[in-house]
Regions:
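Fungal secretory targeting signals
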Residues: 1-26, 246
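Active-site catalytic motif of lipid deacylating hydrolases and related acyltransferases
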Residues: 23-156, 214-235, 241-244
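Extracellular/periplasmic catalytic domains that process cell-envelope and extracellular macromolecules
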Residues: 75-78, 112-113, 153-154, 163, ...
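Gly/Ala-rich beta-loop-alpha elbow adjacent to hydrolase catalytic centers
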Residues: 161-167, 171
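Conserved hydrolase catalytic core segment
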Residues: 174-186
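Active-site nucleophile loop of the alpha/beta-hydrolase fold
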Residues: 188-198, 214-216
């Protein structure tokens, strides 16, 4: 299942009227508003673009108070749902800002705070070099290990494996490192701005995979340009959360 939409910087004011700003989740409302207010008119290569992403994440994090590191699974938490998330290139913590925290808020709006174990991918530098290599090897191995940990420690949880940008490469790589039984046990996979868009996930039913790729997102064709369309996947987290908990 794939969603796409043509988005350009010049259309953002119009898009803002259509974004889900009337949701009950005030954190998500605030985040989307701040994102639109601070979204850069960007058309940069990876090295320059990631610097801008880091600056944008800093602004969004300070204004919204978004949590950038989660280690619930490592702390022994077993909830009904477990989100294991890999952040995008140049993002902070183990969870990032642009997609990870908004996705958490949308999920918690459905299952409550007690219904969700939240875990970011560790040992993952989220560097440009990692993206160009097809996804950081250490981060990929850590995500595979986290999924295996959830499978053994919390067999009744419903795992949502998710990532943004290079984080999607991490998801693809990690699932490829799992045995067939563990991979097929994953409840849902949700990918935002996937450089490997169109590549099947080993031993995961395609009906359980949802990919968001904006038409104007060069990263979704494994490119090396950062454009505004790559920075606004927070607008999709409500429908993503509905899918992930279905």
């Amino acid at each position: 299942m794939r969603f796409s939409s043509a988005l350009t910087y010049s259309s953002l004011a119009v898009l803002g009227l259509g974004l889900p700003l009337a949701l009950r989740n005030t954190l998500l409302n605030e985040f989307l508003t701040v994102l639109l207010q601070n979204l850069p008119d960007i058309n940069e290569d990876l090295n320059d673009g990631t610097t801008i992403i880091t600056d944008l994440d800093t602004v969004l994090g300070k204004i919204t108070g978004a949590t950038t590191t989660y280690n619930d699974l490592d702390s022994g938490s077993c909830a009904e749902y477990t989100l294991i998330f890999a952040r995008g290139t140049a993002e902070p913590g183990n969870f990032g800002v642009l997609v990870g925290p908004p996705f958490v808020w949308a999920l918690q709006d459905i299952v409550g705070t007690d219904g969700l174990t939240i875990q970011g991918v560790n040992d993952y530098s989220a560097s440009v070099a990692g993206y160009l290599a097809g996804g950081d090897a250490d981060g990929s191995a850590n995500m595979a290990s986290l999924i295996n940990q959830a499978h053994s420690s919390c067999p009744d949880t419903k795992v949502i494996a998710s990532g943004y940008s290079q984080g999607c490469q991490i998801v693809h790589n990690a699932i490829g490192q799992l045995d067939a039984d563990t991979a097929s046990w994953i409840s849902k996979v949700v990918l935002f701005g996937d450089p490997d868009n169109g590549t099947a996930l080993d031993n995961v039913d395609s009906a359980n995979v949802l990919t968001y790729c904006n038409t104007d997102d060069n990263i979704c064709v494994n490119g090396d340009l950062i454009l505004p369309a790559h920075l606004i996947y927070a607008k999709n987290v409500v429908t993503a959360a509905t899918f992930a908990t279905s």
